[in-house]
Amino acid sequence: MTTESYTIKIRRPDDWHIHFRDGEMLRTVVPYTSHYFGRAIVMPNLLTPITEVVSAKAYRGRILAAIPEGDNFQPLMTCYLTDTTESSQIEIGYKEGIFTACKLYPANATTNSSHGVSDIKNIYPLLAVMEKLGMPLLVHGEVTASHIDIFDREARFIEQVMEPLRNQFPALKVVFEHITTKEAAQYVLEGNNNLAATLTPQHLMFNRNHMLVGGIRPHLYCLPVLKRNVHQEALRAAVASGCDRFFLGTDSAPHAQQKKESSCGCAGVFNAPSALPAYATVFEEMNALPHFEAFCSLNGPKFYGLPVNEGFIELTRKPSTVIEHIDCNNEKLIPFLAGEDARWDVKVTD
């Protein structure tokens, strides 16, 4: 691994999994994505979830209003699936270009998921509609039964939910989001072209020791939680393999500092300001930079059936200090790698 300065140029990337929140938080964080990314799949888990076309249109409007002048960015909206979601909302939203995909949250799996699906069979009729439309299903892949250890929830999800689901709907396009385990990585590698996965920078850079040894680091706490080193290494090997069904999804999820640094802290890593340097660092460490552009900019559009972005960004191998905090509504947001020297500096070239 060299420390010499050099520059790589890639197609403008996309973020296939992000949380913008709403209100002042949305207005604060959107520019950190819109400046560098061409598109982003926007998660629908607001306090009042995005379950209908009308609410998706309104939310998209609020996002568009937060994009700084000059940024060429398109938010791609998703529908939050519930036990009572109407298939007409999915079909109309997809055909009108409002919904790009639907999101499956097992009930109570993560932030604002209490409205999620209680039993996957409850939405089988919806999945049949999606399969017919060619509409992707985005999956938070964890079971939530109280007796299952939090570190085992993803692996158990594959056995109990994902495999039966894919057997029932073999033509359904499925994104296994923010995978964290060797079991998930292997499952996707062995899958067909209808199965893909996103990976976050924190799960590629760190494991649970980084979060827990020598003191708890709450700004590394997210769901699914960081796992053992063996799982981290499996994720790194997966992206380094060049498999075109792995792509960038930051799962950037901002919370105010006081909500992270508390006796019962919120799950979520706000990584939008530092995600691209972090990903580049991992690919460099894995001697996989030849696959970096595909992971960031090509694999996602291929899976979703969308054109690649026309613009470009440049990443230069030189230190660039990550901002320590971002002010938001009289509170602070602490970004991923806050105050640290990232190895890469990023700029837009078009």
From Swiss-Prot:
* Post-translational modification N6-carboxylysine, affected residues: 103
| Residues that, per the record, bind Zn(2+) 2 | 103, 140, 178
Question: PROSITE patterns this protein is in?
Answer: DIHYDROOROTASE_1, DIHYDROOROTASE_2
For the protein in the UniProt heading, the enzyme class is hydrolase
Q: Which residues are recorded as binding Zn(2+) 1?
A: 17, 19, 103, 251
Query: What InterPro entries does the entry give?
Result: Amidohydro-rel, DHOdimr, Dihydroorotase_CS, Metal_Hydrolase
Pathway assigned in UniProt: Pyrimidine metabolism; UMP biosynthesis via de novo pathway; (S)-dihydroorotate from bicarbonate: step 3/3
| Entry keyword Endoplasmic reticulum | no
GO CC, sorted alphabetically, is: cytosol
| Cofactor dependence | Zn(2+)
User: What's any GO biological process attached to this entry?
Assistant: 'de novo' UMP biosynthetic process
Query: Which PANTHER family did the record assign?
Result: DIHYDROOROTASE (PTHR43137:SF1)
Q: Which family does it belong to?
A: Belongs to the metallo-dependent hydrolases superfamily. DHOase family. Class II DHOase subfamily.
Which HAMAP family does the protein's record reference?
A: PyrC_classII (MF_00219)
Q: What protein name does the entry list?
A: Dihydroorotase
Q: Which organism is it from?
A: Photorhabdus laumondii subsp. laumondii (strain DSM 15139 / CIP 105565 / TT01)
Encoded by which gene?
pyrC
